[in-house]
Amino acid sequence: MDDKKQHQDNLHIGRLIKSELARQGKSITWLSTQVNCTRENLYKVFRRPWIYTDLLFEICKALDYDFFNECSEFYKRHKDAEI
């Protein structure tokens, strides 16, 4: 599998969060205050394809967006395929 195809088939939660934050027009400073996390740590979150569930829960509440559902939908689409 080439890198581009693999990239498209993998869930990257950090990119999803960054995208939703931008869509809502909110700053990383705002989010860091809401979730009690430094901006530097949030930038690291954006670069990672994984996240701790407790932090994801806080981000979901702050942005009023269900990222857990994104994960669930990804699972449903890929549960029978090799990831």
Region annotations inferred by a language model:
Residues 15, 19, 44, 72:
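DNA-binding alpha-helical recognition surfaces that contact promoter or target DNA
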Residues 31-32:
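Short alpha-helical "recognition helix" segments of helix-turn-helix
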Residues 1-27:
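A short, Lys/Arg-rich alpha-helix, primarily the initiator
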Residues 48-61:
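Short, basic-rich loop-to-helix N-cap that marks the start of a DNA-contacting helix
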